[in-house]
Amino acid sequence: MAATLAPPRAAERPGRPRGGHRLFAIVLLLAAALRVLVMLGYDTARLYWYDSFTYLDTAVHLRPQGAFHPAGYPWFLWALRPFESVELIAAAQHAMGLGTGVLIYVLLRRRSLPGWGAALAAAPVLFDPAFVRLEHAVLSDTLVIFLVTAALAVLMWRAEPSARAAAAAGLLLAFAGLTRTAAVPLIGLAALYVLLRRGWWRRAAAGAGALAVAGALPLLVYAGWYAQHHGRFALSGSDGVALWARTMTFADCSVIRPTREQAALCPNGVDLDAASEYVWDPRASLNRLPGDRFSHNDLARSFALRAIAAQPLDYLSEVVKDTSLAFTWEPVAHPARMAPSTTFPRGSWPLPEEHALVGKVRQEYDPDIRGMCSVEPYASILAAYPYPWFLHGTLFGVLLLLGGAGAAARPRPVLLPWSFAVFLLVAPVAALDFDHRYVLPAIPAACVAAALAVPPLLRLAYRVAGPGRTTLRV
């Protein structure tokens, strides 16, 4: 008996999706049920010291933070402040998580992928516990993921994005950058995509210009607001400290030859297991200087740039080594005090009441703020939820490889989401350190790129196999 395999049909030009959406409706319903179960399985949203409380405090007293946290996420929290409920924040973010899955699905259907393929590409965002747990926490990750995915969908909805679509994508990426500054360079990648994608050079320049202007204006306004409060035209005051911490895993001052002022930031014998630990450890050389660590941001940046210029291969080696932690078959703790997993834990997580900011936020944002506890019997059901780590780590590496192969074979539809995924994965590691949390924004773009890579790779395989039809014995 023989089955005939005809060449796959081209899927380059976006069009109306073929077939119904019944399968994805079932998938979305299951994903929503999982999130309802999470809301029942935990008695409140997860609050982390000190990130969550800094975000909530900034939402009450709107001002740009001088350190790691720009004000994009606090604006979202400010909009929900009248309800005085961190549980509502979690519910809204669960809705965003579902929305991200929907965006992936509709974009891929628009690109003529079958319903099962588009639903499969959306599945990691909808069912990976790492995403769902972040949605249930007062952290900025879910908002960043939603904004970046929305920008991708807007830019790729048509084969040649209009100037209006490009401007909308620029705004979305700007707000993503104001939520997490690592997303700011995506504006440049998107503008380059529009410039190369559109047919006539005048239309291409107009589209890229619209995206660049729409992306730059919110950043410039924010930088001016930041300057009013901190006397410096910038988006944050922590970039130098972060990059200095990155260099502490390889810096050799006998090679770097720092200036007398920079020499105070040389490694002092403290050996920590992750670059990010040097930011907070009181024994690290930066933290032994007088004043607040972030008051030395410019000095830290100058040292870090000098170190990278003197030891570029050591720097690249550390970035590659830490980035590879994203693809492991089993979870690797980094730093050792953090235990990554794709499970829903049971237990209680009390708040550090010794910090005055906890009581201040409770008084000003939500009087019912408390440490999160699991609730039975729902927590036991969640604890039994099966999602092996390799579907989170190793599969992500496979998706990136598939997207990279597709970008090489047919770059037009695949290159933008693949470049977004690679940048979102590598940039945080290059700027500070690897964190399992920071991998998540790259996964939706990687799913889109991998899904779009399949048709051109199948066509390439068919051409290599030979013209006409291929007969397979089954």
Predicted regions: what they are:
Residues 41-56, 64-87, 235, 296, ...:
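Extracytoplasmic catalytic/substrate-binding loops of multi-pass membrane glycan-assembly enzymes
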Residues 20-46, 127, 214-225:
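Transmembrane signal-anchor helices characteristic of membrane glycosylation enzymes that use polyprenol
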Residues 50, 89-99, 120-155, 162-164, ...:
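Multi-pass, polyprenyl lipid-linked donor-dependent membrane glycosyltransferases
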Residues 111, 151-166, 195-198:
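Membrane-interface transmembrane helices that cradle and orient dolichyl/undecaprenyl
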